[in-house]
């Protein structure tokens, strides 16, 4: 992925961000977490990632592994880790 070729449309970026922040996904609600994973998986795939869904436990929300093609096969890459559930007290 050549980041210099990405079209940064501020309105499109805000629309995409709005979908993410509007998706309530409490940790204890598997279906809600998976709805958030659906949004993330779709957006990552649209950016060129290969996306794999992983179900770690039948009562827990899925995990996503997204891989972007590296221009130099075998070279070191970058690992980004995060979570997509919303934490409630």
Name each region found by the language model.
Residues 2-89:
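Acidic/His- and Gly-rich active-site-bordering loop/insert found
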